[in-house]
Amino acid sequence: MSHVDDGFRSLTLKRFPQTDDVNPLLAWEAADEYLLQQLDETEIRGPVLILNDTFGALSCALAEHSPYSIGDSYLSELGTRENLRHNGIAESSVTFLDSTADYPQAPGVVLIKVPKTLALLEQQLRALRKVVTAQTRIIAGAKARDIHTSTLELFEKVLGPTTTTLAWKKARLINCTFSHPQLANAPQTLSWKLEDTGWTIHNHANVFSRTGLDIGARFFMQHLPENLDGEIVDLGCGNGVIGLSLLAKNPQANVVFVDESPMAVDSSRLNVETNLPEAFERCEFMINNALSGVEPFRFNAVFCNPPFHQKHALTDNIAWEMFHHARRCLKINGELYIVANRHLDYFHKLKKIFGNCATIATNNKFVILKAVKQGRRR
């Protein structure tokens, strides 16, 4: 938990999920402060749009202006809602939209936290292009090291004249004025053929490894089990290639695709519809924080390629939460399979949670692990 006085409100903010006290990560950064410094409250006219507000620092500070918080992270929405409540601000003060929704027309102010993925930034700028005016104040912010020439060129190409500020506390801002430059249309998804399957994989802008099959998933797919039945989960599904493979290999099983990214879940749904339409009735698609709120003892197996970062921050908190949720939701003798970089040492984490762990396969970079939910552990 951390405190910030941004000139609009004095706030107490925390990350979601919370990090441990030994290695705490802040719920806000200098770019948030820098963005807010640019705004004199008397200047704010028309709707306020906030894009990629990681844990609600901007939304909480500007809550009296009833902002729209737009992004592709359910975790960020949960974190923002928690911080609104913690600071005594009504959750209804902020309207949450995902990035593929229609944005409000003629906003007065647009604040953008530059996302890690350039493709997501382009999708969001193209959506803004449809609603902003020459009078809209457009300001983006990030760590100085994360603003590149390609970032500035993208703003210039999609929206119009772009300048950048001097660095302040290692943060930098981008100012942009909309001038309606000519711009070719772009496809909604990026698609590629998945070798040895005949499948075409469709990827929305914020999907992990959207330009091709990542090597961890490739290794995982080579070792997926067959002859499973009941309900199984592709946890952190991304574009759904693991779940697709499980559907094909296990015709008696139903697959639940789960991710905190609406774009990932939409990509998974599209990929089942276009590649295995006959299996669609065996699927469920869920935008969620891991398996929060899912009943215990439901699933026969969970498959997971866990992230080890949240936005720009390296953390194993999300993976740790996924493992605990998986154990709670597995039936007795249900199995968790994960693929991970070898250096992350998830073997000992799984053994601590499940009381057991076995190595299924390994290569020079990745390891596939299996843990079984045993009845003697609660």
UniProtKB/Swiss-Prot annotation:
GO CC list: cytoplasm
EC number assigned by the record: 2.1.1.174
Give the range the annotation lists for the signal sequence.
none
In which compartments does the protein localize? Cytoplasm
Asked if Cell membrane is a keyword of the record, the answer is no
A Pfam family assignment: MTS
**Source domain of life:** Bacteria
Q: Which UniProt keywords apply?
A: Cytoplasm, Methyltransferase, rRNA processing, S-adenosyl-L-methionine, Transferase
Entry-linked SUPFAM superfamilies: S-adenosyl-L-methionine-dependent methyltransferases
Catalytic activity line of the entry: guanosine(1835) in 23S rRNA + S-adenosyl-L-methionine = N(2)-methylguanosine(1835) in 23S rRNA + S-adenosyl-L-homocysteine + H(+)
Primary enzyme class: transferase
Annotated GO molecular function terms are:
23S rRNA (guanine(1835)-N(2))-methyltransferase activity; nucleic acid binding
Write down the InterPro entries for this protein, in alphabetical order: DNA_methylase_N6_adenine_CS, rRNA_m2G-MeTrfase_RlmG, RsmC/RlmG, SAM-dependent_MTases_sf, Small_mtfrase_dom
Q: Record's PANTHER family?
A: RIBOSOMAL RNA LARGE SUBUNIT METHYLTRANSFERASE G, RIBOSOMAL RNA SMALL SUBUNIT METHYLTRANSFERASE C
| HAMAP family, sorted | 23SrRNA_methyltr_G (MF_01859)
Q: What does this protein do?
A: Specifically methylates the guanine in position 1835 (m2G1835) of 23S rRNA.
The family note in this entry says: Belongs to the methyltransferase superfamily. RlmG family.
Name of protein: Ribosomal RNA large subunit methyltransferase G
Task: State the species of origin.
Answer: Salmonella typhi
